UniProtKB/Swiss-Prot annotation:
The lineage of its organism: Eukaryota, Metazoa, Chordata, Craniata, Vertebrata. Residues 19-209, 210-401, 403-600 form the Albumin domain. This is Serum albumin. Disulfide bonds join 77-86, 99-115, 114-125, 147-192, 191-200, 223-269, 268-276, 288-302, 301-312, 339-384, 383-392, 415-461, 460-471, 484-500, 499-510, 537-582, 581-590. InterPro entries: ALB/AFP/VDB, Serum_albumin-like, Serum_albumin/AFP/Afamin, Serum_albumin_CS, Serum_albumin_N. The keyword Lipid metabolism does not apply. Residues 17-20 form a propeptide. It is found in: Secreted. It comes from Bombina maxima. Gene3D superfamilies: 1.10.246.10. Keywords: Calcium, Cleavage on pair of basic residues, Copper, Disulfide bond, Lipid-binding, Metal-binding, Protease inhibitor, Repeat, Secreted, Serine protease inhibitor, Signal, Zinc.
């Protein structure tokens, strides 16, 4: 699709009064200005995040000293001090501080080259060298020790958490890190009062880690869309999300929010984390200033402190659809002027269609709504060439209904299969399906991908029907996005490449409809294809499941054209062999004797 509709959002911004003011030139930020926006504790946190994301190997104690010095300077700047650093652009100030760290080059050999440059080249150099450092994820102390420290000095415990998360996730947005620190604070406060602290921390921290992972993956996906499909596709996706979440907002408000959110993502994705941090706070402030024009659900979030507001707004549930909103917008299919509107202001007209359809259909996935807009544009191009264009457009409604029905039925079908089989067997079904599609992908990667797909199903199929499709296709899109990023450096086949890069909105559909790899030549089964060892008798349950799935994937790779039923028969034989040999006195001797028999059965499949 020609995503020219997205230019509309910028055109409209120029034609109407700004809801949010944005300078045409980049805004130069200063320390005192930022200090005034948040309270001192949050300011310290933001400074620590910025330093830890740039200096991932630097000890906490060293960064803590820098935080104190910068905070003291910020307080003076905010009070009107004439210190030279108060008039130094924020990113320049931070990089000056970083480059002044004693023996910096001993830890970061590339820092000498970076620090010799002038901004913005210096900043770009630092961004290029920012990578997650191994072993820098937060390691929680034992509950009793943690609670004792928390009781003595809560701020220090939270600062250590911020430090570890920041250096382990150097591209995670600063407000997001602070938001997770607030949640961690709540976990400590609650669990330290519980009798079974260990279980409490384990359960709550597992949930927090999952939430952090999801936010990070979502942020990376926005950046991947921006890099691979361009700003206009990202803008279309943001318009859909905003329209679904805020159905009471006018088109003007929705498109301006979209423009702001997209610009924020551009800054964040390009690595300008300070600007990203400030713009995120400003967007939150602006949203709350105009909350009555956006959503009735916002008021509660906007009563919270600035940093907490951001997390609240991002996770806010969809507003209720206005009761007086007509279910159908006749303008797009029955208005005699429809082709004139399309011809005169194509971009604006199509953007408005996306907005109107999105706000009426929160039960549809973002990607399906983008496909619908794509189909509508195609229908207009075809019908507006005809004399009876209105009849032609009405015929297009059947195509639209079929697309919605197909996606709905697919979600229902997969949920029914998963509910019937259970997670493990459902993953095995997916494993067979995707190994046939992509036999060149490594077995561990196939197991990893299908496990995450199963987790998406487990989460989304439990939701109400109105939420299943957005959850499922949204989750699968994130998995596919990560997979396609891997495909860039490890090409698989032309069909997969086409699914990854031809169309963002059609990615999931493309992978679902992808057939077996017709270019794949299966290797011969040899004595080295399968190996069964006595550790099959002692492995923990999860590792044993992985071993079984590794066997299934390898079997599909050597016999890609047999039926699922035959794969199932061999899997049953594998299980029987394991049970027999694990009951034998000499496990390995038994496996050595049974292995050739099972291999021979595998060779005979579809022979």
């Amino acid at each position: 699709m020609k995503w020219t509709i997205l230019t509309a959002l910028l055109i409209i911004s120029a034609e109407s009064k700004n809801l949010y003011k944005r300078d045409s030139e980049p805004h130069i930020r200063f320390l005192g200005e930022v200090y005034k926006k948040v309270d001192t504790i949050d300011f310290r946190g933001l400074v620590l995040i910025t330093l830890a994301q740039h200096l991932q190997k630097c000890p906490f104690e060293e960064l803590a000293k820098q935080v104190e010095q910068i905070t003291t300077l910020a307080q003076a700047c905010a009070a009107g001090a004439r210190h030279a650093d108060c008039a130094t652009p924020l990113i320049t100030l931070f990089l000056n501080r970083i480059c002044a760290v004693p023996e910096l080059s001993a830890t970061y050999d590339w820092s000498t080259e970076c620090c010799a440059k002038s901004d913005p080249e210096r900043h770009q150099c630092f961004r290029a060298h920012r990578n997650p450092a191994p072993g820098t994820h937060y390691k929680r102390p034992e509950p009793e020790e943690l609670c004792e420290s928390y009781k003595k000095n809560k701020e220090d415990v939270l600062a250590h958490y911020i430090y570890e998360v920041s250096r382990g996730h150097p591209v995670l947005y600063s407000p997001a890190v602070l938001g997770f620190a607030y949640q961690f604070n709540g976990i400590c406060s609650h669990c330290c009062e519980e009798e079974d602290k260990t279980t409490c921390f384990k359960d709550r921290m597992t949930q927090l880690k999952k939430a952090l992972h999801i936010v990070e993956v979502q942020q990376k996906e926005s950046c991947r869309i921006l890099d691979n499909f361009g700003v206009r596709v990202l803008q279309a996706l943001k318009l859909v999300k905003i329209s679904k979440k805020n159905p009471k907002a006018t088109f003007e408000v929705a498109q301006k929010l979209t423009s702001e959110v997209t610009h924020l993502n551009e800054d964040c994705c390009h690595g300008d984390m300070l600007e990203c941090m400030i713009e995120r706070m400003e967007l939150t402030e602006h949203t709350c200033e105009h909350h009555e024009d956006i959503s009735t659900k916002l008021k509660t979030c906007c009563e919270k402190p600035l940093i907490e507001r951001t997390h609240c707004i991002v996770n806010l549930e969809n507003d209720d659809i206005p009761e007086d909103l007509p279910k159908k917008v006749t303008k797009f299919v029955e208005d005699p002027e429809v082709c004139k509107l399309f011809a005169d202001k194509k971009d604006i007209f199509l953007a408005e269609f996306l907005y109107e359809y999105g706000r009426r259909h929160p039960e549809l996935s973002d990607q399906l709504l983008l496909r619908i807009a794509k189909g509508y544009e195609h229908q207009l191009e075809k019908c507006c060439e005809l004399e009876n264009f209105l009849e032609c457009l009405k015929d297009g409604e059947h195509v639209l209904a079929d697309a919605i029905k197909e996606s709905t039925e697919l979600t229902e079908k997969d949920c029914a299969i998963q509910q019937k089989l259970g997670d493990y067997l459902f993953q095995n079904v997916l494993l067979i399906r995707y190994t046939k599609k992509m036999p060149h992908v490594t077995t561990p990667s196939l197991i990893h991908i299908t496990k995450h797909m199963t987790e998406v199903g487990d989460k989304c199929c439990a939701l109400p029907n109105t939420q299943k499709m957005p959850c499922a296709e949204g989750g699968l899109s994130l998995i596919i996005g990560e997979f396609c990023e891997m495909e860039k450096t490890h090409p698989i086949n032309e069909h997969v490449k086409n699914c990854c890069w031809k169309s963002y909105s059609n990615r999931r559909n493309c992978f679902t409809n992808l057939g077996p790899d017709d270019s794949y030549v299966a290797p011969e089964i040899t004595d080295d294809t399968f190996h069964f060892t006595e550790d099959l008798c002692t492995l923990p349950e999860e590792e044993l499941k992985n071993k079984k799935q590794g066997f299934i994937a390898t079997l599909v790779k050597v016999k890609p054209h047999v039926t699922d039923e035959l794969y199932g028969q061999i899997a049953v034989e594998f299980t029987k062999m394991r049970e027999k040999c694990c009951a034998a006195e000499d496990h390995q001797a038994c496996f050595n004797a049974e292995e050739p028999i099972l291999i021979e059965h595998c060779k005979q499949l579809a022979a």
